[in-house]
Amino acid sequence: MRLLDGRSMAADIGRSVVDDVERLATTGVTPTLAVVLPTADEAARSYVRVIERGAAKVGVGCAVHELTGDPDELTATVDRLAADPAVHGMIVQTPLPDGLTAADVGARIPVGKDVDGMNPLSLGRLALGLPAFAPATAAAVLEILNRAAVPLAGARACVIGRSSVVGKPAALLLLAEDATVTVCHSRTKDLATVAHDADIVVAAVGRPKMVGAGHVRPGAVVIDVGTNWTDAGLVGDVDADAVAPVAGALTPVPGGVGPVTTMLLLRNTVRAAGG
């Protein structure tokens, strides 16, 4: 079984990002990412610290805006950053204040600055095959598969999870690579049987160790998007101990999709700045 090391892939991406940042610096541009923290949520703050560390490594500016949980303050902040030419990329962390949805907030982010694919227009453009930033986690799934040289054209892919953040955009990205995609969810009957037919299994349901050996055909590639905190620590949606003897390749948790996601956010910011 091949372990798909997201940390080493992220480091490779980071080196190319540094090159692009240095090239932009010759034109007087510093790619800058604005991160909005709408509420005092510790999990969100923890992730933002990861983004800040990554940005510092590659030379991307990162401005964090910590808010009080007031909906009007959030929309005003997003509108101000959207109009600021010094801001090239924007992300808004969840949870959001009561009364606001991700679609409400995302619609206020210009598509050109929407480096995490939060604007519904970005998802629509993705569905139509038009240029747009995909949600970084979904893009990380494809990045890992491509870097691991996993054949996608004609492959059978099973995406377990249908969120607009991971499942749906990951399915669209796989379709764009000519994979044959099945999207499963909580109402899917005989999930294990459906998943077992796939060459590629993407687990993105937010349920610890839900995907077991019975879901995976011998030699299949398994991408574990899950990040679940349990008494035993951080675990994915895949029971890695059970699946590893069966799978041909598997992303670890931690150290798989997460590091690639962070670096893609920064790469998107550089691209939004003209890099």
From Swiss-Prot:
Gene3D superfamilies, sorted: Leucine Dehydrogenase, chain A, domain 1 (3.40.50.10860), NAD(P)-binding Rossmann-like Domain (3.40.50.720)
InterPro entries reported in the protein's UniProt record: Aminoacid_DH-like_N_sf (IPR046346), NAD(P)-bd_dom_sf (IPR036291), THF_DH/CycHdrlase (IPR000672), THF_DH/CycHdrlase_cat_dom (IPR020630), THF_DH/CycHdrlase_NAD-bd_dom (IPR020631)
MF annotations from Gene Ontology: methenyltetrahydrofolate cyclohydrolase activity; methylenetetrahydrofolate dehydrogenase (NADP+) activity
GO cellular component: cytosol
Record-listed E.C. numbers: 1.5.1.5, 3.5.4.9
UniProt keyword terms in alphabetical order: Amino-acid biosynthesis, Histidine biosynthesis, Hydrolase, Methionine biosynthesis, Multifunctional enzyme, NADP, One-carbon metabolism, Oxidoreductase, Purine biosynthesis
Chain sites annotated for binding NADP(+): 161-163, 186, 227
The keyword Transport is assigned to this record: no
Disulfide topology: none
Reaction it catalyzes: (6R)-5,10-methylene-5,6,7,8-tetrahydrofolate + NADP(+) = (6R)-5,10-methenyltetrahydrofolate + NADPH; (6R)-5,10-methenyltetrahydrofolate + H2O = (6R)-10-formyltetrahydrofolate + H(+)
GO annotation, biological process: L-histidine biosynthetic process; methionine biosynthetic process; purine nucleotide biosynthetic process; tetrahydrofolate interconversion
Pfam families documented for this protein: THF_DHG_CYH, THF_DHG_CYH_C
Coiled-coil regions listed in the entry: none
PANTHER family xrefs: C-1-TETRAHYDROFOLATE SYNTHASE, CYTOPLASMIC, C-1-TETRAHYDROFOLATE SYNTHASE, CYTOPLASMIC-RELATED
Family that this chain belongs to: Belongs to the tetrahydrofolate dehydrogenase/cyclohydrolase family.
Subunit details: Homodimer.
Record's function text: Catalyzes the oxidation of 5,10-methylenetetrahydrofolate to 5,10-methenyltetrahydrofolate and then the hydrolysis of 5,10-methenyltetrahydrofolate to 10-formyltetrahydrofolate.
Protein name, UniProt field: Bifunctional protein FolD
Organism of derivation: Parafrankia sp. (strain EAN1pec)
